[in-house]
């Protein structure tokens, strides 16, 4: 089955019984609706499972100079999950969770962080050493049409990648690009800057995590909806419901909403829990020591 934007558009038209040759909804319109429903309906539904879908982290080396850090730009809801400090640069087993404070609490604690606007502020001062990991839920990339990506067909190790067609106009020398996997959940495996781009070739100094069949896209774009494959039918149905609403088809809208509700109910057991045989265990978190802020 084709899960690229091209395939999703075809599935939506079949489910909504929309003729292929109609002019009411263009492919661009349908992709816009896919992105709206993905971010506004499907992502919140998946997050409500509370099974750490989309969880990732940014890692920042500490040197005693940085007291404030921007919340990652691609964090869903512009919020974070937690912050941990790895006190060893070589052993990830030595870490502590940094407590979140409010401005009214800072005088009662020897150290932590608080949120001010879109920034994370360390208190009482910068941390001298270690690796700070900011865990957050990453927003799925924007679904784009086939005119904005190319498929890797040949890899010249640590030199370049060659695509099956010429690179699209949005990918040029110096462009920020993403390499997207061709297997679900279609993660972005590499975020990098394109070297010299010529026809179907992109020069890259590191190709270690790229495979034939992966997709080359502009930054924060993807041929796919970057969600579990089992939730793709929900996304398709939600777009169908939106179409019925736009067309003023009251009967179709009501039927579509009932179908979506049933599909969502059936789907919930597929995405949660993510581990069936082992319940979550709650343990005492590692605690910070005062020396971290000395």
Model-derived features: where do they sit?
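Residues on the solvent-exposed faces and adjacent turns
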Residues: 165
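Short, structured beta-strand/loop micro-motifs enriched in basic residues and often containing a Trp
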Residues: 156-162, 198-199
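Glycine-enriched, solvent-exposed interface loops adjoining structured elements
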Residues: 1-156, 169, 180-189, 201-203, ...
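Conserved hydrophobic positions within beta-strands
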Residues: 152, 194-197
